[in-house]
Amino acid sequence: MVDALASGASIRKDVEVRVLSWAPFSSGGIRMMEEKPVTIHLYKNDLPDGLTLGPIVAIDCETMGLNPHRDRLCLVQMSDGDGNAHLVQIEKGQSAAPNLSRLLEDPDTLKLFHFGRFDIAAMYNAFGALAAPVFCTKIASKLVRTYTDRHGLKNLCQEMLNIDISKQQQSSDWGAPDLSEAQKTYAASDVMYLHQLRDLFIERLAREGRAEIAQACFDFLPIRARLDLAGWPEIDIFAH
């Protein structure tokens, strides 16, 4: 639990939920339902002062839609992989979140994303803070799971972790002042498994000899997000 409040940030409430996941019996292919407790911390406007999330932080965003110039940032969720999810509600018109921005720009903190291109752009558009360094599980998936075109987070969790996450709240009103328990649980699930996925992808990227090219993609990702915002969202600037 968090003991201190940030100046300009307030704790709304902390709740413990149970994320239902599928895990195999040790004997083989039969699967059983396993409960994984997750504590959700909900804040207003920014992370609280003094909160430390460690050297590797999973991050995801919820917005009012998919157009960053039209649809505002509503929620940023984070986890350091310890079973805690930290959710920050962003108000309409808010243009600064100092503690969150410091985390995004901290060169000693690796930020984990799934489809980071969108999240990096959304937060840069809102606060002017460019996340780096980064790791994107969707890019990693496309580099090593070439046997499929299904690279969604739900697909990765099912195949690689034997976990089934719900996407029912993906399209909902994230700008509401009071989020439902279902929304908070959904938001938490989007960051709870990225650390495990990263570990597995690091092994696969090394196995397939694609770790170096993956790192180059991750290094370029913040610039790709800026290009999206600057007017080149669907254009390959490297094309003839």
What kind of region is each of these model predictions?
Residues 1-4, 17:
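Short, positively charged low-complexity motifs
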Residues 7-10, 21, 26-27:
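Serine residues within intrinsically disordered or low-complexity segments
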Residues 24-74, 78-240:
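DEDD superfamily 3′-5′ metal-dependent exonuclease/proofreading module
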